[in-house]
Curated annotation (Swiss-Prot):
Role of this protein: Catalyzes the synthesis of the hydroxymethylpyrimidine phosphate (HMP-P) moiety of thiamine from aminoimidazole ribotide (AIR) in a radical S-adenosyl-L-methionine (SAM)-dependent reaction.
Cofactor list: [4Fe-4S] cluster
Subunit-structure text: Homodimer.
Pathway assignment: Cofactor biosynthesis; thiamine diphosphate biosynthesis
EC category name: lyase
InterPro entries according to UniProt: ThiC (IPR037509), ThiC-associated_dom (IPR025747), ThiC/Bza_core_dom (IPR038521), ThiC/BzaA/B (IPR002817)
GO biological process entries: thiamine biosynthetic process; thiamine diphosphate biosynthetic process
Protein name per UniProt: Phosphomethylpyrimidine synthase
Signal sequence annotation: none
Organism the protein comes from: Rhizobium meliloti (strain 1021) (Ensifer meliloti)
Residues reported to bind substrate: N217, M246, Y275, H311, S331, R332, G333, D372, G373, L374, R375, E411, Y438
Cofactor remark: Binds 1 [4Fe-4S] cluster per subunit. The cluster is coordinated with 3 cysteines and an exchangeable S-adenosyl-L-methionine.
Pfam family, one: ThiC_Rad_SAM
Length: 611
């Protein structure tokens, strides 16, 4: 480990627990040294209920009074796990070059991260991927960590749980065991994105037989943003529930900004290496080469990028299929490779060198996210020949990657109307061997710029129910501009709703716990518990307090929507109390004879005087 000259003042980020919450840790059994983080939400003492345990991806940032120093990075919790396997070696790594940061100099150059760690790679002939270990029958600490995390702290039930949902062929177990995690990874149905050079990340899994995950995109552009802003966006996104973060930076300082993000990220980080490679050739797509791209892959793998989006499915003879589209090729990576292919009139270097890319990924355990460069950018283009031709190629590439012990997920659309969404899921499962699907939405209509987090949230909930393993968020700024901090939160919350709705619909055994707890709090007028159990406690509280701001209103048996006389839940309480007093049968007879709820026909038809 080498130290670089520290910053005069390191940037600060959002810290502190969410309301009524505390971080708790569950130990491992196979690997007793692991500590799996979760969030406990305390309920009001009058509820008589235990705290509600929820999945937590926020890392140390939500620990009470945590000592966080961005210029030091997070604890390297997986380092010992990686080294104990005995199949890696440390080395000096490549030197940082001027082109790595877009030739930025002087005050325009983002400072280097103060700590340099020697990168690790596989020893010759070894594959250090979670897939290789799973196939060898090894239950890694990462796998046990994930099993505990997916169970949300639950113990195995003695009897089968009652299930309510339609899983469309998914096999979500009542209780996730480390062995189940191993089997799913070995079969290619799930991935654990965990680069050996990103030991700060807490292990998580992406697969349709697990909780639906969400990704948040961040990154600078040639126009705006800085290192401090991007690190804060990452912390902010994970605070609200992002399971992974993609750094899609396209401007200067890509290398240095990414280093700051990775060293401080408790979740896997993904990238599109093509973006940085393009910066290295001054933005001229035709000047891209395998040599430049290969160097970029190694650079990012050494830093600790956990998954690469690789647009290797854009083949030369597919490009003419996009000519008659309404919106052509909308993927940045797809359009870059299409331009390169047409200029050189040959298959892309990503396709021709795919096995070489696999060799790099298996040496660092970088997972593939096979990019959908020909995804539809409008509902008019959904499910067309170009889209599905590329998908079939991605299925072929998946088999090549699996043969090299590389982990793979498949990226999906895009813009798809509701009635065409399930066809996407069914076809992906069929042609890609059930590799995890990772979709951008899809957006279900094109008429709502400024509200595309909603148009896409609809599609995301549907395709998550049908089997998509991870949903890439869309913010209100989609198609309009670079999202800021508030947009990131809106996008994450929207997609947490979609993912959770999908888990409920699939019948995930732990999904309803939080819903039921909030519903009971709502019925019992426990306002503080309602706020604290929600995905966004601050917004829930603020909306309530806009009209009923006094502390006395936090125990009131009504809200400003109905007021005290028309609150349906208050009336339900009265009905329940009277029913318990007189007996249900007597109450039913009373109402049939013309009680408060049912009136005889002649009375109900009689108009009051004066009308």
């Amino acid at each position: 480990m080498n130290l670089v000259k520290p910053l005069a003042a390191a940037p600060s980020v959002t810290q502190g627990p969410l309301p009524a919450s505390r971080k708790v840790y569950k130990p491992g059994d196979i690997h007793p040294d692991i500590r799996v983080p979760m969030r406990e939400i305390a309920l009001h003492p009058t509820s008589g209920e235990p705290p509600v345990t929820v999945y937590d991806s926020s890392g140390p940032y939500t620990i009470e009074n945590a000592d966080i120093r961005i210029d030091a990075g997070l604890p390297r919790l997986r380092s010992d796990w990686v080294l104990k396997r005995g199949d890696v070696e440390s080395y000096d790594g490549r030197a940082v070059k001027a082109e790595d940061n877009g030739f930025a100099t002087g005050e325009r150059l983002t400072p280097e991260f103060p700590v340099r760690n020697r990168p690790l790679r596989a020893k010759p002939g070894k594959a250090v991927t979670q897939l290789a270990y799973a196939r060898a029958g090894i239950v890694t600490p990462e796998m046990e960590f994930i099993a505990i995390r997916e169970n949300l702290g639950r113990k195995a039930a003695k009897e089968a749980l009652a299930r309510d949902g339609e899983s469309f062929g998914a096999s979500v177990p009542d209780f996730v065991t480390p062995e189940f995690v191993r089997q799913e990874v070995a079969a290619g149905r799930a991935i654990i994105p965990a680069n050996i050079n990103h030991p700060e990340a807490e292990p998580m899994i992406i697969g349709r037989n697990f909780l639906v995950k969400i990704n948040a995109n961040i990154g600078n552009s040639a126009v705006t943003s800085s290192m401090a802003e991007e690190v804060e966006k990452m912390v902010w996104a994970t605070r609200w529930g992002a399971d992974t973060v993609m750094d899609l930076s396209t401007g200067r300082n890509i290398h240095n900004i990414r280093e700051w993000i990775i060293r401080n990220s408790p979740v896997p980080i993904g990238t599109v290496p093509l973006y940085q490679a393009l910066e290295k050739v001054n933005g001229i797509a035709e000047d891209l080469s395998w040599e430049v791209f290969r160097d970029t892959l190694i650079e990012q793998a050494e830093q600790g990028v956990d998954y690469f989006t690789i647009h290797a499915g854009v083949r030369l003879h597919y490009i003419p299929l996009t000519v008659d589209r309404v919106t052509g090729i909308v993927s940045r990576g797809g359009s870059i490779m299409a331009k390169w292919c047409l200029h050189h009139h040959r298959e892309s270097f990503l396709y021709e060198h795919f096995e070489d890319i696999c060799d790099i990924c298996r040496a660092y355990d970088v997972s593939f996210s096979l990019g959908d460069g020909l995804r539809p950018g409008s509902i008019a283009d959904a499910n067309d020949r170009a889209q599905f031709a590329e998908l079939e190629t991605l299925g072929e590439l998946t088999k090549i990657a699996w043969a090299k012990d590389c982990q793979v997920m498949i990226e999906g659309p895009g813009h798809v109307p509701m009635h065409k969404i399930k066809e996407n899921m069914d076809k992906q499962l069929a042609v890609c061997g059930e590799a995890p699907f990772y979709t951008l939405g899809p957006l279900t209509t094109d008429i709502a710029p400024g509200y595309d987090h909603i148009t896409s949230g609809i599609g995301a909930a549907m395709i998550g129910w049908f089997g998509t393993a991870m949903l890439c968020y869309v913010t209100p700024k989609e198609h309009l501009g670079l999202p800021d901090r508030n947009d990131v939160k809106t996008g994450v919350i929207t997609y947490k709703i979609a993912a959770h709705a999908a888990d409920l619909a699939k019948g995930h055994p732990a999904a309803r716990t939080r819903d039921d707890a909030l519903s009971r709090a709502r019925f019992e007028f426990r306002w503080e518990d309602q706020f604290n159990l929600s995905l966004d406690p601050e917004t829930a509280r603020n909306f309530h307090d806009e009209t009923l701001p006094k502390e006395a209103h936090k125990v009131a048996h009504f809200c400003s929507m109905c007021g005290p006389k028309f609150c349906s839940m208050r009336i339900s309480h009265d009905i329940r109390a009277e029913a318990q007093k007189e007996g249900l049968e007597a109450m039913a007879a009373k109402y049939r004879d013309g009680g408060d709820l049912y009136m005889p026909l002649d009375q109900s038809n009689a108009a009051p005087a004066g009308e």
